[in-house]
């Protein structure tokens, strides 16, 4: 399989927006009242031309002091230096922590040779300093030392890779579609973060425009079913990569089933 879910674990998030590790087998949700419980997994996709990272996780380190994202990329059979393209759905903290890494007391890009594709409006929003959802110091490092491509609206990155400005979760959220080896991969970021959100219709209060996100999920779900997309779910609890079918409603199954 060319797509790899780089799981970073399960977390609880309260009103402080701090991500605290949560072990469903040992921790009691009642001890964390008022919290959301989510999983985090960036994705790595090998195409004919690129090694693509889709969003970058929390930036946590493992027990050896290594960036967890780097460790997970190696476990998938690649080296972090091989990543050529970093596609960012948006720039909230839980999607950007792994974009930078500290070595010998200095912080630099975690993927110095990769092109980072970011919506210009989202980039500018991150520098405003008006929301705790963004960590400005990360973007200062990227601005100084990384290859950043700022895009606007919707378009083509290169052959087979497209981006679409959606809004919904935040004003400048974008999604990506990648055609490779006869398959189409769809990364919906936080507009379509879990397969369950296709099955259960709701407008989330944590979205910038919850109703629009709900409508987008319906739209993308229908396209995914009609065109046999392989969907990547960044906050999925169980099924991180799935294909969508639609009869009376949506269902999602593993690509191999």
What do these predicted ranges mean?
Residues 86-96, 166-173, 233-238:
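Histidine-centered catalytic micro-motifs
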Residues 2-8, 42-46, 52, 153-181:
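Core dinuclear metal-dependent hydrolase active-site scaffold
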Residues 51, 58-144:
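Active-site HxH/HxHxD metal-binding segment of metal-dependent hydrolases
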Residues 59, 74-75, 110-165, 170-244:
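Metallo-beta-lactamase
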Residues 1-49, 245-246, 254-257:
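Zn-dependent metallo-beta-lactamase
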Residues 27-33, 104-105, 163-164:
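Short, P/G- and charge-enriched loop/turn segments at secondary-structure junctions
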Residues 8-10, 56-59, 91, 121-122, ...:
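Active-site metal-binding loops of divalent metal-dependent hydrolases
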């Amino acid at each position: 399989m060319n797509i790899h879910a780089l799981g970073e674990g399960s977390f609880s998030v309260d009103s402080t927006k701090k991500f605290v590790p949560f072990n469903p087998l040992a921790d009691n949700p009642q001890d964390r009242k008022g919290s959301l419980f989510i999983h985090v997994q960036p994705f790595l996709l090998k195409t004919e031309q690129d090694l693509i990272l889709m969003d970058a996780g929390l930036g946590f380190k493992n027990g050896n002091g290594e960036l967890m994202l780097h460790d997970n990329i190696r476990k998938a059979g690649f080296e972090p230096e091989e990543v050529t393209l970093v596609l960012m759905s948006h720039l909230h903290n839980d999607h950007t922590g792994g974009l930078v890494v500290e070595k010998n007391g200095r912080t630099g890009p975690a993927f110095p040779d990769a092109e980072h594709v970011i919506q210009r409006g989202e980039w500018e929003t991150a520098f405003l300093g008006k929301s705790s959802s963004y960590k400005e110091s990360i973007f200062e490092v990227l601005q100084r030392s990384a290859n950043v491509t700022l895009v606007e609206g919707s378009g083509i990155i290169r052959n087979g890779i497209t981006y679409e400005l959606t809004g919904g979760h935040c004003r400048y959220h974008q999604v990506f579609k990648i055609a490779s080896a006869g398959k189409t991969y769809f990364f919906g970021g936080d507009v379509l973060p879990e397969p369950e959100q296709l099955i259960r219709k709701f407008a989330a209060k944590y979205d910038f425009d919850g109703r629009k996100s709900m409508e987008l999920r319906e739209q993308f779900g229908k396209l995914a079913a009609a065109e046999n997309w392989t969907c990547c779910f960044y906050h999925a609890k169980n099924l991180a990569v799935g294909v969508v079918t639609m009869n009376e409603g949506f269902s999602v199954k593993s690509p191999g089933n």
